[in-house]
Amino acid sequence: MFRLLKRACSFLLLFVIYQSFVIHHNVQRVLAYKPMVEKTLAENDTKANVDLVLAMIYTETKGGEADVMQSSESSSGQKNSITDSQASIEHGVNLLSHNLALAEEAGVDSWTAVQAYNFGTAYIDYIAKHGSQNTVDLATTYSKTVVAPSLGNTSGQTYFYYHPLALISGGKLYKNGGNIYYSREVHFNLYLIELMSLF
C-alpha cells in the first residue's frame, strides 16, 4: 500500500513539474508579443491594457497560432482567414476597445466586454438588461438561449470542457454556444502570466 502511494505521489509530482514547464513555455511565447501589443495599443484610443490583451492571447491560442487573438471569425466570418499576428492583434484590440466603450456606455462591468469578445457585442446589451454584471449563470443562459441556437444547436446539446475553472461549475459547455467561462479564464490568466513572469 505504501509503495503504491509513493508511486502515485511521484507520478503526481512529475505531472505538476511537467505542467509547470508547459505553462511557463506558453507564457514566454505569449510575452514575445508584448512589444507588438504595446505598439498597437499606443496607436489606438482604448481602455484596453497590455496585460489584459496578453491574457486574452494566452486564453485564445497561448501564442501558438498566427491568428493569436482568433480574430478571423469576427473579421471575416471565416476561421483562420487572418494569417498574420500583427493583423490579428490589431483587429482583436479594435474589437476589445469597441466592446469596452460599449460596456461603459451601457453601464456594465468591463468583464462583460471581455466575455462579449467570445459571445459577440450583443451580450453587452443583454447584461445591461439583466443586472449590469457578468456572471457564469447569465453567460450560461445566454449561451444556451442565444449563441447556441443562432449557430444551429436548438436542442441544448452540451459537451464536457476540461478546464479547472469549468470543472468547478460542472464542466459543461453548449455545442456552438461559445465559452461561458471565457472572461473568468482571461481573469485567471492575468494572474498566471504575472506569476510565471517571475521565473
From Swiss-Prot:
Compartment(s) where it occurs, according to its Swiss-Prot or TrEMBL record: Cell surface
A Pfam entry, by short name: Lysozyme_like
InterPro entries with a match to the protein in the record: CwlT-like_lysozyme (IPR047194), Lysozyme-like_dom_sf (IPR023346)
GO cellular component, one term: cell surface
CDD domains the UniProt entry points to: CwlT-like (cd16891)
Membrane-traversing stretches: none
Taxonomy, superkingdom: Bacteria
Designated name of the protein: Pneumococcal vaccine antigen A homolog
Species in which this protein is naturally found: Streptococcus pyogenes serotype M3 (strain ATCC BAA-595 / MGAS315)
Taxonomy of the source species: Bacteria, Bacillati, Bacillota, Bacilli, Lactobacillales
